[in-house]
A protein has these predicted regions:
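Structural/interface elements that position substrates and couple domains in central-metabolism enzymes
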Residues: 1-286
């Protein structure tokens, strides 16, 4: 569910590995392009030939009708946007809206895998409650199984990242993790790293991105200082790289894109729910 910049290559990878795959998206124009065998990601190399093959062979189709598509599925991937609102609070509306739809559509023990980046604990609380429903009409572990496998790929290098980067897997029920691992190993042929639960897997994904955000902010501050001191920033960084445990970051306009700026606020949102004194350095880096 969700066939955007990262999600469509994911769907193509599943279809190319032999699975009959249905891409579900509210963007009807995108759905029409896919079903018309018109590849929508012109600037993403490596997937165009796969796209042509799997669409022609009937392995990949697209629809905006979630009610018709889901009963046909054994495994459901959620790869939906998790942006910020105007108050810099993570907006999980897309995931929660789909979660409510799943409540009326699941019943056969399907596995639901969340690839979207979310704050630790969101899966086990808000999303799980949403899928089970207020009246607990569905039961996790009986009517469906919930797991996570956070996506890890950079636009423009998605195929290369899919083929080399290990993936994390966590689940509400421990017994589901090996099943998800086997599925992703079959599709991507990469290492799957089991996590003890969903929130740990989500924390790892956030930590890798927020680490970059903080260090980029730090080096930008240093660059401003060095300019006043008459020191060349790049000379300092290149010389500092001689030490094996120094991880080089370079000054620039700051982080951008749909992920890194949001990820820091996801951690900050988590922190505020517990104790606002946590993660001051993350707030300063923003």
């Amino acid at each position: 569910i969700g066939i955007g910049r990262i999600e469509l290559p994911t769907a193509l990878s599943f279809a190319d590995s032999g699975f009959v795959t249905i891409g579900i998206d509210i963007n009807t124009k995108l759905v029409e392009m896919i079903n018309s065998n018109e590849y929508p990601l012109k600037d993403e190399p490596g997937f165009d030939k796969i796209f042509d093959n799997v669409v022609k062979n009937g392995k990949l189709s697209a629809t905006s009708n979630i009610s018709n598509a889901l009963p046909k599925c054994d495994v459901i991937l959620l790869s939906l946007p998790t942006p910020m609102n105007k108050e810099n609070i993570p907006d999980y509306t897309a995931l929660l809206t789909v979660g409510k739809s799943l409540n009326s559509l699941l019943s056969n023990g399907q596995i639901v895998i969340v690839e979207s980046t979310v704050e630790p604990g969101f899966i086990e609380t808000e999303l799980l409650d949403c899928i089970e429903g207020q009246d607990k009409s569905l039961k996790s572990g009986i009517d469906f199984h919930l797991a996570v496998c956070p996506e890890t790929a950079n636009p423009g290098e998605i195929m290369k990242d899919f083929q080399k980067l290990p993936r994390l897997v966590g689940a509400i029920e421990e017994k589901i993790s090996p099943i998800v691992s086997a599925l992703y190993t079959h599709v991507f042929n990469v290492e799957l790293i089991p996590m003890p639960n969903c929130k740990t897997a989500n924390a790892v994904k956030l930590t890798t991105n927020v680490f970059r955000d903080i260090n980029i902010a730090f080096i930008n501050e240093l660059a401003l200082l060095f300019e006043k001191l008459g020191i060349d920033t790049h000379t300092v960084i290149e010389a500092a790289k001689r030490k094996y445990n120094f991880q080089a970051h370079f000054p620039g306009p700051g982080v951008g894109g749909p992920c890194l700026p949001v990820n820091s606020y996801q951690y900050l949102n988590s922190s505020k729910k517990i104790n606002e004194s946590f993660l001051k350095i993350v707030q300063e880096a923003r």
